[in-house]
Structures are given as C-alpha cells and as structure tokens.
C-alpha cells in the first residue's frame, strides 16, 4: 500500500491516478493550506516570483493584476495555468529552485537593469525553502516577501494510519515537500514508530527532501528524476515491480 501525504485536494487526484494504474493507496494529509490575504497587491515594477502551485492559484484569483506583470515561476503546471489565464510576460519557467537561481544569476540581472525593475516580489507561503531564499538575496536585487498562505500541520497520525504503519501494510510513502518530510518524521518519533518505518520505501519529489529522510537514518529513499508528479509516478513503477 502507498501512503499519500499531500493536502486533500491534491491527494485525491493522486489516489485516482494510482488506482487507475492498479496501486492500492491510503490518504493521510499531513497539511492543509489557508489563504492569508484576501486581496493581493503586487508591487509596481517588481518581478513576481511564484514557487508553488498554491501561490500561483492564489495569485490567479486576483482581478487587479495586469496580464503584462513580469513573472518568474517554478513548475510547468503553474506556468500552464498562468498562460491559460492570459499572463504573457513570464520571464522564465524553471523546473526547480536550483534552476531558478541559475536563471536569476545568468539572465535576470541583465533584464533587471534593462527594464529598470525595482526588485523581486517573492510570493509564497509562511514557510519557505530557507536555502533558496538565502541564495535569492545574494544578488544586488531587492527582494520583498509577500506571504499569501500558511500551512496547518497535523499534530498526530489518525488511528487508521497508525495501525497501517504498525502492521507494516504501508510499503511506499510519497512526500512532496521538505515541510511535510519534517512533519512526517516528527510524528513518527512522537508515536514511536521509527522501527516500523524502516521497511517503508520513501519516494520524494526532490533530492533536498530525500536528504532530510536520509539524515534521519532512513536509507530506502529515492527521488523523482524530475520534480513533478509524472516523473514520481514513473519512479514508483520501478520500485513496486
């Protein structure tokens, strides 16, 4: 059985995809999101940086943002949503945070000077990838953070999930974010389930997430070749063969 830890809406979509491929899965959503700002005010002459689907979805709800707003985005799905909504000034779509840093270093600095932009407005959740944020601030470009949402995390496993782990029914656990990986490990320690989880194969969306698990003593860990759900499902097929 595969344990899905994504927020409920995304978890249901993934469960449906896995069911179609013949996989049995169980949902335990480690987190849920809550929008903080009802009205989004984007700073004039700043480049908007969107690094998650959730931030992109909230950004797209605003009716007061120009379709010519300069945008940098991480993730092909987010880019597609922006394109469909009519935003035609996407400066770059990166596959992950490292690729985005590469674009900023090699190309955005020149664009920033030519277009006379005032800085980068990083639209994100309350919790962010601190390593990425640190790298983002190392260039001579002002960076302003705008928090669009916050994540609420579960404080314990529910009874069904705990029993599935204790009975070693869970064979694979998928983790899509560093925050969820840390929360999963926290709950495992709290419930004293470390030994039961040693047999679980952890499949993650990135090397950074895998590193968190390996640092906690778990060695049955792999990450998708590309940071997207399609690549993760392809990797899953190799694991459960």
Where are these regions (language model features)?
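Signature of uroporphyrinogen-III synthase
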Residues: 1-241
């Amino acid at each position: 059985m595969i344990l899905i830890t994504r927020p409920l809406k995304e978890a249901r979509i993934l469960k449906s995809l896995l069911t179609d491929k013949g996989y049995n899965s169980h949902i335990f959503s480690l987190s849920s999101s809550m929008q903080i700002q009802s009205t989004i005010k984007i700073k004039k002459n700043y480049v908007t940086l969107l690094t998650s689907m959730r931030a992109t979805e909230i950004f797209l709800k605003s009716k007061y943002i120009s379709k010519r707003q300069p945008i940098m985005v991480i993730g092909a799905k987010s880019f597609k949503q922006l394109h469909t909504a009519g935003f035609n000034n996407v400066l770059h779509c990166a596959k992950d945070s490292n690729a985005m840093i590469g674009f900023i270093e090699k190309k955005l600095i020149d664009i920033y000077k030519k277009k006379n932009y005032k800085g980068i407005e990083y639209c994100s959740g309350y919790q962010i990838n601190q390593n990425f944020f640190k790298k983002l601030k190392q260039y001579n470009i002002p960076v302003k953070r705008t928090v669009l949402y916050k994540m609420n995390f579960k404080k314990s496993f529910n009874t069904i999930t705990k029993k599935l782990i204790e009975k070693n029914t869970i064979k694979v656990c998928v983790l899509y974010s560093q925050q969820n990986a840390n929360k999963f490990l926290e709950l495992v320690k709290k419930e004293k389930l470390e030994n039961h989880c040693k047999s679980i194969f952890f499949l993650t969306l990135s090397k950074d997430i895998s590193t968190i698990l390996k640092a906690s003593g778990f060695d049955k860990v792999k990450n998708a070749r590309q940071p997207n759900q399609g690549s993760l499902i392809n990797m899953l097929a190799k694991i459960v063969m």
